[in-house]
Amino acid sequence: MDSYYKNKKKINFSKMHGLKNDFMVINCIKKNVFLTSHIIKKLSNRYTGIGFDQLLLVEKSNSLLTDFHYRIFNANGNEVEQCGNGARCFGLFLLLKGLTNKKKILISTKKKPLTIEFLTENMIKVNMNEPDFKFYNLSSLQNVLDNNFSIKLMNENLICNLVSIGNPHCIIKVQSVKNAPVNIIGDSIEKNPIFPEGVNVSFMEILNKKHIKLRVYERNVGETKACGSAACAAVAVGIAQKLLSDTVHVELLGGKLIIIWKGFGTPLYMVGPAKHVYDGYIYI
């Protein structure tokens, strides 16, 4: 048995989840870990690997202004810019492993820094920065305000709204999320050539000004139990269009988040739980 592992590398990890959006988290602060997209795909397999939606790497900061660096890889091995549920798990990991004793930390990402604040043992608040409605060369804030951007889909024009929360989101308002064709439309939009890097597609049902239901088709993943940045994106669109109040409860398949946004010129906040499942190690 020892000879089987002789030329393999041992990697310690934690399995975590935020509203059933699950992660493999690796501490790379003292020892850098390089994983190819091929290895990440193998690890993400729920039958032959660890199984996860995203891999999170905890790295030391390259700046005196931030405490840590946060990296995210989808199950297909592609590195992405943002993951809201992952940010909360990232923060809890730092606490559980004794890597910080601060009540509030600033972390760098592939794009903008995020602030993570520990409210209670498992409830974490993340400053997700201000939503960006200038979506590449496709859509603008005015398109969102006028609700007039559409995508050609199956010989019909589908009205939707585009927004970036550090990563790209397409928000579609529906009468009922229960009956929404999430996988069919989500897959079609995500693969549309107008989105060369893909896009997360969300289906939003507005119950009242303080409560929405949301289902999410995540790029390179498929439908997930929850997506924090998608919840932020959907609420941002609703508030911009004056359909929602500044504090909204978002009901996802995996649980609930609270999204707070006071409007243009201010940051958007996400509040929700994070859970540690187990620690383990694997040889690769």
Curated annotation (Swiss-Prot):
Recorded family membership: Belongs to the diaminopimelate epimerase family.
GO cellular component, one term: cytosol
Assembly description: Homodimer.
UniProt keyword annotation of Protein transport present: no
GO molecular function, one term: diaminopimelate epimerase activity
Record-annotated active site: C83, C227
Name recorded for this polypeptide: Diaminopimelate epimerase
Species: Buchnera aphidicola subsp. Acyrthosiphon pisum (strain APS) (Acyrthosiphon pisum symbiotic bacterium)
Signal peptide: none
Enzyme class: isomerase
